[in-house]
């Protein structure tokens, strides 16, 4: 099987080729089976002690656990036979002759060979820690430079597990991590929360999404992405938290406009913790208090650095029993099971009493002996107590609804204690609303949920897309990340964050959707309250793809209802093939040429605001060589005849005007548009402006191989696209597996029907040619790209 989904141009001539996406392990001859773990990749070779730029969940494979699990969200591949092969693209497979079915790895890839020492230009976690580039680890989303003292130090990303000899089988948890034991105090260099600040490597943790590396020696060092603080004595107020920004002082003009967090509270500025999405008020006593992102644990004296949990840390101290600073899940481990609940977006601290505890995914239960089924669910759980039966204690908005603190929800990433006094106080964070008797129908929607009431026609404070388009307000696309619940009384009200608006009494089926569900009632046919995908399949459209991470619920009644969720486009009869793009979708209809109220970066490119590019997370304007080429996902351009420059790209719109040629203040990638191609390449999180001059250009983001002159338009991968070559016409359904690729080895040829995994989709066969509105895994099987191979 060709490794089409990867398209890697790693030749000996281009040593830096391996711009691996979401992980890359420098498979050395010594460790042929190195787990190119997804959401975790380890590449620590003896030669490069700091090499362990683990991505999203590295596991320090000890000799005891040789059979490292080809983890989902991970996959092992690199064999000695194909040293540089795996330039995997969010799902690439380094198909070697020995392992034909090598796991079409998702979110990771292994490649670096001894021949190319600087190879791992890892994306979202790469560290080229060579002696020559000491300051290398500009790690993204993780990366800790293991010190000589702890060569195998689990600088886990999104779930490091401090594998101690006692727990050899320690779960290499993903999206969660278990705190290191007293034996390894600084071990937990967890990403999304921890800092492995050891005396030896003071500036080490260039942690992303949480990590402060403020050392006196390197004042401006931590230009961390998504969470860095360069808190030096010279810049006391430097905590330029994004999503919580701090007033830049004249002394530090270039203060890191940190994204999604960063606090560096120095003694001079005790309250500076303008933390993003989970800040902790630094007290004078703890000047360097962990500017934890998406979680923060108050390490107790007994376990100094222990609970550096990622995405679920709980500083369960006996003094603060109710402490649940739960993030995306997090169970407050009880005294009986001190380190147990290192839940991974689902982990369950299965105590002897509850052996069968549901190892919920995207929902975790912190089953303690006292409360066996306590459902502190992640991403959807409701802690329905007898007192409050419908109390959506959603994670991403979990509320520890105790009788004493009914309104408790100091929810992280969501939570509003809507009291009767402030009925419309929808300060929802990522969704939740503590429904009070007064507002019974408050849909504590998660990642979606719109509840446009008749009273407030424009109230559509949509979350990431959803629009509860009622017949009265057809074009109500008041997108979130820009949503405004403009009511006469509280015009600026909705300080909505990734959140949602509560549905009205008219729709009793209060779509408390969790990442998908839509309670499509007959009364509201177009109620596309899609949650990260779900489509309310009406009788008329029985086969509607209930896509995950993308879904279109367009009914004939509301043709322009494009309440896309993270992309979905309501395919109208006129545009049957409209790409229900994920993370990028344009619903530009002829009637509303400027319609694209894009989420996460929409730019209303009007003649008046030519330089508008509020680029987010990427955006590159391709050169004249490939004018209309990359209509990549994560950045679709809805260029209609009426608005040729309408590229209101999602997650990366660029309004490249001749005046601002170098415009793209690109984030997470983006190549600067040239004057020749005004709005063209709205690349998706990985667009590469493959010009003959910059053949090696790979500004790869989340995927994207730098198309060389030989294959100009080739690798337009979508989070896991597989370029099904003509060689395998029989496998049209090539598993563009997403978030779970199965590595069917030659040993098990009996499992050809690779699971059409969730968070993935297999490209439909010839019977349904246009079918694959694949989510997070579009297969680019075109006849033109037969040569597309890894």
UniProtKB/Swiss-Prot annotation:
It is found in: Secreted. The keyword Metal-binding does not apply. Synthesized by the liver and secreted into the blood from which they become distributed to almost the entire extracellular space. O-glycosylated; contains disaccharide galactose-N-acetylgalactosamine attached to threonines in AFGP8 and AFGP7. Its main location: secreted. Residues 1-5 form a propeptide. Keywords: Antifreeze protein, Glycoprotein, Repeat, Secreted. GO terms for cellular component: extracellular region. It comes from the Eukaryota. Coiled coil: none annotated. The keyword Repeat applies. Contains 44 copies of AFGP8 and two copies of AFGP7. Antifreeze proteins lower the blood freezing point. This is Ice-structuring glycoprotein. It comes from Notothenia neglecta (Yellowbelly rockcod). The gene is afgp8.
């Amino acid at each position: 099987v060709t490794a089409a989904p990867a398209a890697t141009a790693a030749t000996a001539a281009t040593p830096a080729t391996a711009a691996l996406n979401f992980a890359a392990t420098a498979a050395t001859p010594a460790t042929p089976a190195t787990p190119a773990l997804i959401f975790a990749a380890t590449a620590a070779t003896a030669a490069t002690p700091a090499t362990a730029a683990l991505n999203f969940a590295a596991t320090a494979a000890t000799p005891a656990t040789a059979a490292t699990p080809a983890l989902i969200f991970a996959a092992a591949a690199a064999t000695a036979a194909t040293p540089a092969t795996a330039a995997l693209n969010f799902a690439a497979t380094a198909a070697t002759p020995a392992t034909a079915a090598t796991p079409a790895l998702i979110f990771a890839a292994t490649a670096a060979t001894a021949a190319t020492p600087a190879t791992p230009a890892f994306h979202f976690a790469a560290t080229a820690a060579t002696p020559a580039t000491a300051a290398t680890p500009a790690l993204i989303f993780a990366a800790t430079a293991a010190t000589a003292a702890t060569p195998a130090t689990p600088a886990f990303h999104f779930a490091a597990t401090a594998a101690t000899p006692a727990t050899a089988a320690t779960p290499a948890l993903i999206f969660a991590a278990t705190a290191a034991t007293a034996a390894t105090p600084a071990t937990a260099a967890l990403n999304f929360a921890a800092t492995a600040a050891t005396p030896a490597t003071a500036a080490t943790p260039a942690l992303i999404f949480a990590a402060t590396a403020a050392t006196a020696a390197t004042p401006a060092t931590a230009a961390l992405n998504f969470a860095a603080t360069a808190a030096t004595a010279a810049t006391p107020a430097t905590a330029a938290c994004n999503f919580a920004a701090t007033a830049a002082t004249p002394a530090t003009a270039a203060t890191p406009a940190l994204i999604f967090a960063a606090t560096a509270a120095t003694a001079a500025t005790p309250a500076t913790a303008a933390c993003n999405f989970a800040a902790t008020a630094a007290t004078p006593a703890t000047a360097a208090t962990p500017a934890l992102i998406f979680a923060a644990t108050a390490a107790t004296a007994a376990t100094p650095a222990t609970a550096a949990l990622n995405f679920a840390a709980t500083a369960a101290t006996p003094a603060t029993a109710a402490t649940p600073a739960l993030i995306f899940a997090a169970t407050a481990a009880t005294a009986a099971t001190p380190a147990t609940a290192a839940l991974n977006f689902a982990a369950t601290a299965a105590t002897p009493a509850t052996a069968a505890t549901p190892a919920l995914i995207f929902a975790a239960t912190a089953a303690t002996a006292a409360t066996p089924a306590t459902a502190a669910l992640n991403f959807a759980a409701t802690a329905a107590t007898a007192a409050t039966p419908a109390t959506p204690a959603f994670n991403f908005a979990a509320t520890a609804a105790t009788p004493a603190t009914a309104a408790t929800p100091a929810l992280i990433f969501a939570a509003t204690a809507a009291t009767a006094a402030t009925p419309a106080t929808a300060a929802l964070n990522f969704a939740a609303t503590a429904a009070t008797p007064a507002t019974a129908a408050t849909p504590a929607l998660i990642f979606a949920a719109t509840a446009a009431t008749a009273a407030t026609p424009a109230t559509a404070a949509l979350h990431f897309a959803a629009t509860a388009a009622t017949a009265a307000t057809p074009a109500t696309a008041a997108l979130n990340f820009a949503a405004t619940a403009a009511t006469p009384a509280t015009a600026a009200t909705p300080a909505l964050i990734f959140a949602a608006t509560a549905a009205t009494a008219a729709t009793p089926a209060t779509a408390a959707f969790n990442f998908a569900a839509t309670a499509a009632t007959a009364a509201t046919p177009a109620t596309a309250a899609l949650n990260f995908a779900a489509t309310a399949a009406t009788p008329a459209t029985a086969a509607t793809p209930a896509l995950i991470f993308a879904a279109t619920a367009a009914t004939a009644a509301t043709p322009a209802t494009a309440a896309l969720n993270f992309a979905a486009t309501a395919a109208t009869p006129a545009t049957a093939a409209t790409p229900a793009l994920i993370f990028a979708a344009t619903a530009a209809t002829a009637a509303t040429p400027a319609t694209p109220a894009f989420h996460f970066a929409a730019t209303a490119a009007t003649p008046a605001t030519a330089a508008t590019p509020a680029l987010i997370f990427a955006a590159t304007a391709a050169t004249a060589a490939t004018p209309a080429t990359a209509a990549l996902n994560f950045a679709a351009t809805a260029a209609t005849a009426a608005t040729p420059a309408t590229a209101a790209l999602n997650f990366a719109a660029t309004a490249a005007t001749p005046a601002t040629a170098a415009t793209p203040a690109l984030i997470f990638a983006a190549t600067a548009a040239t004057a020749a191609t005004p709005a063209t390449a709205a690349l998706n999180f990985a667009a590469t402006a493959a010009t003959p001059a910059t053949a090696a250009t790979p500004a790869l983001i989340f995927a994207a191989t730098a198309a060389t002159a030989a294959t100009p338009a080739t690798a337009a991968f979508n989070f896991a696209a597989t370029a099904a070559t003509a060689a395998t016409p029989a496998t049209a359904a090539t598993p563009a597996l997403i978030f779970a690729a199965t590595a069917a080895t030659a040993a098990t040829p009996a499992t050809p029907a690779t699971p059409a995994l969730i968070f993935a989709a297999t490209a439909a066969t010839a019977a349904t040619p246009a079918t694959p509105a694949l989510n997070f895994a579009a297969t680019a099987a075109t006849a033109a790209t037969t040569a597309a191979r890894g």
